[in-house]
A protein has these predicted regions:
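Short, low-order "capping/linker" segments at domain edges
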Residues: 10-11, 65-77, 118-119, 160
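Short, surface-exposed ligand-recognition loops at beta-strand->loop->(often short) alpha-helix junctions
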Residues: 31-32, 74-81
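Flexible hinge/switch segments at interdomain interfaces of large molecular machines
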Residues: 14-21, 53-68, 72-74, 102-109, ...
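Cysteine-centered nucleophilic/redox motifs
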Residues: 71, 85-88
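Surface-exposed aromatic
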Residues: 6-8, 66-69, 110, 156
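Extracytoplasmic/periplasmic membrane-proximal domains and adjacent transmembrane bundles
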Residues: 82, 89-269
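Solvent-exposed, membrane-proximal periplasmic/extracellular interface segments of envelope transport
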Residues: 1-64, 119-141
Length: 272
């Protein structure tokens, strides 16, 4: 819970640490049992947990990829990148061979935006860092010590009670220490407001990049599905503004890289 499993298998796609993620590895007794588990899990997850994104997949051989079919949209402006990505997703959903089309940025998440009034902060001897630490300690908590249990070190975290962390009015009452040793409410030096933002923004070669991804139905090959969708995106590519592009990824790209490495050594083997 909170991250992926250890790399027990070379082709396993490693996952970043994040609180909204969990992964389970299930070992079946035989091939038939594995197929029954996959079918049953997919049915249960679709019917009983419609509000989450869940996958029941077989461990695949080959280069590690998160999703077999992927298209990357790169550009400079977040809204424009998302607009193009939505059109790519629409083309992917139109394919009868794709499942669970989504993009890696995820849905916009609620957050608290804090705008520090630098003039007031300087007058009271408050720094932006002290405002950040006070709010972080009240909401997420601050590690104040560690407890040793056998060979494990467990962090001791100090934070406000759950009822206070979830109430906006309690957050606004958080006290921020000043240079004189006194404390002032955070609202005296900053404006705190609720907003929504992207939970994560990926970049590739320093460019904003949003990857649209999909699983595939059984009985088809990912490169074939990706190439068919890629042909459908030709018109969209021709209309892209300057500085924006759509690139193919997933299994097709990784297979191409693997083939290039094989081809690079081929002349040497023939010469030998």
């Amino acid at each position: 819970v909170g991250n992926g499993s250890p790399r027990y298998f070379l082709s396993l796609d490693q996952q970043l640490f994040r609180s909204n993620f969990a992964q389970t590895v299930i070992l079946s007794k035989d091939l038939e049992g594995r197929e029954r588990i996959v079918e049953r899990l997919r049915k249960i997850l679709a019917e009983d947990f419609p509000g989450i994104r869940a996958r029941a997949n077989r461990v695949a051989l080959g280069p590690p990829v998160s999703y077999p079919v992927q298209f990357r949209v790169s550009g400079t402006d977040i809204p424009k990148v998302k607009e193009i990505a939505d059109q790519v997703a629409e083309a992917m959903r139109a394919s009868p061979h794709t499942l669970d089309v989504n993009h890696e940025w995820g849905v916009r998440a609620p957050m608290l935006r804090v705008d520090v009034d630098q003039d007031k902060a300087r007058a009271l001897g408050v720094s932006t860092a002290s405002v950040s630490r006070a709010l972080q300690g009240a909401i997420s908590g601050a590690t104040v010590a560690q407890f040793r249990e056998n060979d494990r070190l467990i962090d001791i975290v100090l934070r406000a009670p759950e009822a206070e962390r979830d109430a906006m009015e309690r957050v606004l009452a958080v006290q921020v220490p000043t240079a004189s040793g006194r404390s002032v409410p955070v609202t005296q030096v900053a404006t705190v407001r609720e907003a929504f933002e992207e939970p994560i923004l990926w970049r590739r070669s320093r460019e904003l990049t949003l990857t649209v991804r999909a699983d595939i139905v059984d009985g088809v090959q990912a490169p074939d599905v990706a190439m068919a969708i890629d042909r459908q995106l030709a018109e969209l590519r021709a209309q892209l503004p300057v500085g924006y592009r759509i690139e193919i990824g997933g299994s097709l790209e990784e297979s191409g890289r693997a083939q290039e490495s094989i081809n690079a050594g081929m002349p040497l083997m023939l010469a030998a």
